[in-house]
């Protein structure tokens, strides 16, 4: 569905939740969801096709940690999932870094997410995790106050600027717009231009339709692997995934 930061009434997970409620209705098309709908099936089929046609040899057999070192080998044409925390290892001079030139300038470029045939204006177009600080009511008041002071220090302008300069993860708009990053922008492969553009607004986090992220997230990789292995077709896989998601949410 259309809607930012998440679609209403159906979000990017394909989970339906009627407006004005906090209870998910379901993920299966039969329950008004979209996890096994045409758009989701198309996305999984296209991912499988691209993996087979364009990924480096052996990529399909890699796990998450094996895939990370391969990025700096220079044998990857396009990456569809990326943690900004890893950007620092992809920039700068290093004999083992094959994705920068002799001057340390990136040979890659970050860009907005591509649009599929089912995407419409007003829908989100990408995903990014959003961090937060949680202060428990059960914690002693004085300790909560200390934690609150530390949190303010950790996200202050000066500290945020330094952390972003080293790790290339941003928590403040002022950091993104700082003159220091205007100077560094050419060596960061489009990262600064992206976060200064409106494109960042359609990269939104998981929304309130997802009642139990850990339980539901683990279902995804288990089922998606069955497409890659050829055990099930994309439609069969998404049907099975939608059924299991509804079972978890019931």
Please report, for each region that a protein language model flagged, where it lies by residue.
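Sec-exported extracytoplasmic/periplasmic mature domains
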Residues: 48-56, 72, 76, 91-94, ...
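Second-shell loop/turn segments in exported
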Residues: 29-34, 137, 206, 227-229
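Short amphipathic alpha-helical coupling segments at ligand-binding clamshell hinges
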Residues: 42-46, 141-154, 216, 233-240
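Long, aromatic- and glycine/proline-rich binding clefts that accommodate carbohydrate-like moieties
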Residues: 106-115, 164-222, 226
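Periplasmic solute-binding protein
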Residues: 1-28, 122-136, 215-225
